[in-house]
Amino acid sequence: MVKHVLFVKLKENTPEQCEKVKSLFLSMKDKVPMVRDIAVGIDYLHSERSYDVVLELVVDDREALEAYQVDPYHAGVVKPYIAEVRDGSTIVVDYEF
């Protein structure tokens, strides 16, 4: 199994924007076949070093993670939207467990 973790800072850190990003991330559970499990969290601390939204998703293996990256819904809908609303700052960690 591989876990993909993405931390995102948003240009507009409003509750509405955070919820929209959360909903979009969660929609991948039903639209991206290689996603086995998914969790999304919204930061409540809002410190200077905090990121606004975190995505954690699980896929079967490295090949599934590669397929996820080019999946039409992820690459064509989710990724472009996040690129538009993020402030340029993201952190990604991918690891096997």
Stretches with model-predicted labels:
Residues 70, 75-76:
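Long, contiguous binding/interaction regions
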Residues 80-97:
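Charge-dense polyanion-binding interfaces
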Residues 1-52, 60-70, 93-97:
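Short S/T/G/P-rich N-terminal loop/turn motif that feeds into the first structured element of a domain
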